[in-house]
Amino acid sequence: MKIYLRFVWILIIILNFLLNLFITTNGVIIVNAFKKSLIVAASFASLSLFNSATAELVYKPLEQPVEPAKPDLKIESVNEKFAEKYPNQYNSWRSTANGDGENIIYADEENPRLIVLWGGYAFAKEYNAPRGHFYAVTDVRNILRTGAPKTANDGPQAMACWTCKGPDVPRLIAEWGEKDYFNAKWAKGGPEIVNSIGCADCHDTTSKDFAEGKPALRIARPHVLRALDALEKATAEKDKAEGRPHNNLSFNTAARTEKRAEICANCHVEYYFAGDIKQVTFPWDNGQTADDIEKYYDDIGFTDWTHSLSKAPMLKAQHPDFEIWSLGMHGKNGVTCVDCHMPKVQGADGKVYTDHQIQNPFDAFDHTCANCHDQSKEKLRDIVTSRKKEVKDVMGRLEDQVVKSHFEAKAAWDAGATKEEMEAALMDIRHAQWRWDYTAASHGGHMHAPEVVLRVLASGLDKVADARTKLAVILTKHGVKTPVQIPDISTADKAWKVMGIDIEKERKAKEEFLKTVVPQWEQQAREKGLLVDPPAQK
C-alpha cells in the first residue's frame, strides 16, 4: 500500500508538471480545477496511510533513579599516579596523543552539509573527527559547541557534556550524587574535570586485585549500570521469544567477555539528556537497533532540538559504537573492542601487557586481525576499504536528500503550509536523519557491522523519499514551483552564512574563554591536587 501511494503521489507531481507545461492560457480554469482535485485526492491518501505518524510529539520524560552521594566510594582520578607501578600501560595510554590524533580534522569543513543537517543545534558550529583519549578534556573545552562561559552558572551546555571525558566524572558523582552532578551547567565542572579518559574509567584502581596487577574491571557511572540492566531485560525477552541463546549483559553478573566490551559502553554509546536535570540516559529499554531506539524516543516524545529550517523535531545520535558492534558478526562471535583495539603485546622489559594505545587494528595487525584471520593484511585492508566506500557512498546520497528535504520544508512553511499539513512529512525527516546520524556518528560502523549500517541507511532513504513526496504535494498545493532552489553550501563558510551562524563571533568568544577562564580552572585543579605533571619519560 505504501509503495502504491508513493507511486500515486509521484504520478500526480508529473501530471501537474505536464499540465503547467503544455496547457495554454485558455485552459487555466480546467487546469486549476484538475490540480485541485489531484491535491485533494493526495491529501485523503496521506491521511488514510499516515494518520498514526501525525500525532504531535509531547515529551513525557521517564522518571530515572538518582543515586545519592557515596562518600565511601573512592575513585583515584589522577592517571599519573599509576605511571610508576604500570609503566607499560601508562606510556601506551599517553601514546594516544601521537600519530593521527595530533591533528584535528574539521569534519564540518570537509562536509558542509553537516552544518545544514544540524541547523539550529550546537553541532552546526563545529564538529570534528574523534581523536585519542588523551585529548578528551582538551577537545571538549576547545570545541565551539560548549560556548564561552564566564562563571560556573553560565554557558549553553549542561554538566552532562563532561560525562564521557574522564575519571573525574565518576569521582564527582560519588562525591556529589547524581542529582547535584547533572543538575548544573557545564562550566561548573571546569575546575574539577581535568584528567582525560584513563585508568579509573575502566578499573577499580583502589582494589586489591588492581594492586596485584589484575584488570579489576569496574563501571563506576551509575547510569551505565542501569542501562546495561535494562538492556539485559530487553534482550533476554527477545532471545527467549525467538529461541536464541542469551548472554547475561548486567555488568556485575556478566561473564568476562561481556565485561570487556561493556567497559567501552561507558562512553561509546547512544544516550540523551533526560528530564529537567539533563541526566545522561541510554535509550535501551527496547533494545539497541536504530528502530528500537527510535521507538523509545517516539514513545516518550523526546526531541533533541527543532530544526531551524524545516521545524522538524530532530534527534541527534551520539556515537552508537557498542550498539552497532553488538549487532555485527564480531559482536555476535564474542570478539570484543579490547581484542581488536587493545591487543596483548610484549614490552621492552619482556613483559606481556595490554596495549592502551587505543588504535586502528591494522596498526597492530599481527596481534589483532591475524589472531583469527588467515588472509593477508593487504587483502583484509582492501575488503575494509571497499566496505567503507560502499557505506560512504550511500551515506552521502542520504545526506543530500535530507538536506533537500529541510529546504523544501522551509519553502512549504514560507508559502503558508499549516502545522497539520506538515506533521507527517516532518516526522519522516526526523526518522530519515536519525538513521543517517545513527550510522554517521558511529566510529567504524563500516567495519563493525557493514550489513547493519547499509540496511539502516537504506531505510533512511525510504524515509526521506516519503518526506519529499509529501512535501511535493504540499508545495504544489501552495503554488510553489519545484524543484526548490537550494542555496550554495559548497563550503563551510557559505553554509554557516546560509544557516545564520556568525562563526567569527563564536571563534573570538572561544579564544577569549581559553585565554582567561581555562587557566583559572587548571590553577584551581592544581591547588586541589587533581592535576599533576606527567612523570619524565625514561
Swiss-Prot record:
Gene3D superfamilies: Butyryl-CoA Dehydrogenase, subunit A, domain 3, Flavocytochrome C3, Chain A
Chain residues that bind heme c 3: H133, C264, C267, H268
UniProt gene name: nrfA
Location in the cell: Periplasm
GO terms under cellular component: outer membrane-bounded periplasmic space
Binding site for heme: C161, C164, K165
Sequence positions that bind heme c 5: H330, C369, C372, H373
Residues noted as binding heme c 2 in the record, renumbered to the chain: C199, C202, H203, H356
Domain of life: Bacteria
Signal peptide (from-to): 1-55
Protein name, per record: Cytochrome c-552
Keyword Translocase belongs to the record: no
Chief location of this protein within or outside the cell: periplasm
Binding sites annotated in the UniProt record for heme c 4: C337, C340, H341, H448
Family annotation (HAMAP family): Cytochrom_C552
Residues engaged in binding Ca(2+): E270, Y271, K316, Q318
Top EC group: oxidoreductase
Pathway assigned to this chain's UniProt record: Nitrogen metabolism; nitrate reduction (assimilation)
Reported function: Catalyzes the reduction of nitrite to ammonia, consuming six electrons in the process.
